[in-house]
Regions:
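A short, basic N-terminal segment
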Residues: 1-42, 134, 257-279
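C-terminal alpha-helical "lid" subdomain
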Residues: 43, 55, 61, 119, ...
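Sensor-1/coupling segment of RecA-like P-loop NTPase cores
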Residues: 142-152, 156-186
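A short helix-turn-beta junction within AAA+ P-loop NTPase domains corresponding to the substrate/partner-engaging
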Residues: 182-197
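Walker A/P-loop nucleotide-binding motif
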Residues: 39-57
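Conserved P-loop NTPase "ATPase switch" module shared by AAA+ and STAND
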Residues: 126-152
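Conserved catalytic segments around the Walker B and adjacent sensor/switch elements
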Residues: 63-79
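Conserved NTP-binding/hydrolysis module of P-loop NTPases
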Residues: 9-12, 80-110
């Protein structure tokens, strides 16, 4: 739990302030802010490193403490049971009064909670979750979410349709694939999609310059480095930051020069894909 002195603007879950890579996203921030205030569910889509988590982090951080503290954030889930257990655990850590009443009725204590939760069936976990959230004024953020199964989609639909709990999905698959899936499962359209695109050239250069200072690259020979990195990164903010971080490692330097092609290859080999949707 977060101590009382640190509770301002803190979501329920491990969502750090993403201000360092929050660049030129004011229109997207306004759209997300509006959706949260109006309790509208949303899918936030884009390639790895585009800034989805940073966008959510910054928007929540800017909300008053009472609203920010009702944001339930999960980073990656394995399956339906994992999703349900993580959500119930977050509500327990937030001392949700509806859940606490359920636990008191069943005689569950602080010492027995973990074992009780582990022993619940999927149907009991669903009932426990739904009863807890329907009067709790929560917003649920699901980050790094795998492709949806019908069982998981059913829980998400129950949350935002029947329990007045909007859900925000942060996904990195191709836009067309996700739209088809969400349309089939939730009857969502383009209105429920917030697609993050690469930064404008000016913003990408500004971010690059801040990274050059941040990672101590200014003493190196940066001839052609700026132009090459902006081009190779495809103006994806996470790619700019991570490739600059790699460039600060002496293994990627030859004398005073940066081995930018090696940086780029190792960045891709680490699992990042810069194939961007056109359109």
């Amino acid at each position: 739990m977060i101590s009382k002195g640190d509770q301002r603007n803190q979501p329920i879950g491990p969502l750090a302030n993403g201000q360092s890579v929050f660049v030129d996203r004011e229109s997207e921030a306004c759209r997300l802010r509006e959706a949260i205030l109006k309790r509208e569910s949303l899918v936030i889509c884009g390639p790895a490193g585009i800034g989805k988590t940073s966008l959510v982090s910054q928007v929540i951080h800017d909300f008053p403490a009472a609203l920010a503290g009702r944001a339930v954030y999960l980073r990656s889930v394995k399956d339906l049971e994992d999703l349900l257990r993580q959500l119930i655990r977050k509500l327990y850590e937030a001392r949700d009064p509806n859940l606490r009443r359920q636990l008191h009725t069943e005689g569950v204590t602080t010492l027995s909670f973990a074992g009780w939760l582990k022993g619940l069936s999927s149907s009991r976990m669903r009932g426990t979750l739904y009863r807890a959230v329907e009067r709790g004024d929560y917003r649920v953020f699901l980050d790094h979410f795998p492709p949806l199964t019908h069982a998981v989609a059913k829980v998400i639909k129950e949350l935002f349709w029947m329990r007045n709990t909007p859900v925000y999905l942060l996904v990195r698959d191709r836009v067309e694939h996700r739209i088809d899936q969400f349309s089939a499962f939730f009857y969502w359209s383009d209105r429920e999609l917030l697609a993050l695109k690469p930064l404008p050239a000016k913003a990408a250069i500004e971010l690059l310059e801040s990274c050059i200072e941040r990672f101590g690259l200014s003493q190196l020979d940066l001839s052609n480095y700026r132009e090459e990195l902006v081009e190779l990164s495809k103006q994806v903010p996470g790619a700019i930051v991570k490739m600059c971080a790699l460039a600060s490692d002496p293994r990627y330097q030859y004398g005073s020069r940066i081995k930018i092609k090696t940086v780029y290859i190792d960045y891709l080999m680490s699992g990042h894909n810069l194939s961007l949707h056109k359109g």
